[in-house]
Swiss-Prot record:
UniProt source species: Bacillus anthracis
The name this protein goes by in its record: Fluoride-specific ion channel FluC 2
Regulation affecting activity: Na(+) is not transported, but it plays an essential structural role and its presence is essential for fluoride channel function.
UniProt gene name: fluC2
GO BP terms in the entry: cellular detoxification of fluoride
Record keywords, A-Z: Cell membrane, Ion channel, Ion transport, Membrane, Metal-binding, Sodium, Transmembrane, Transmembrane helix, Transport
Role according to the record: Fluoride-specific ion channel. Important for reducing fluoride concentration in the cell, thus reducing its toxicity.
Catalytic activity: fluoride(in) = fluoride(out)
Pfam families, per database record: CRCB
Residues that coordinate or bind Na(+): 70, 73
Amino acid sequence: MIEALLVATGGFFGAITRFTISNWFKKRNKTSFPIATFLINITGAFLLGYIIGNGVTTGWQLLLGTGFMGAFTTFSTFKLESVQLLNRKNFSTFLLYLSATYIVGILFAFLGMKLGGI
């Protein structure tokens, strides 16, 4: 039961944080590139890498990794925004978004793990 509470608590704060950051960026960004989701996802990749690389206890992994990072990052919005770019025939932005999200996300997860392991 305590494990579920840790995940739920982390998830609550992760979702609220993503909502706040996403809305802040969307009000200020008028380009076709979905910068809010991109920054949220690469930040989340780095932080999750750092958490895991740091070797935190299972409780902290549940609270921060599964709960907070699980709700903070958003795979579904990334996919939806990618499809929307395709539907608008914005192919160059689509390719940039797709490739940058995967390449930078993996790089940031790696860096987070390395820095967390120091």
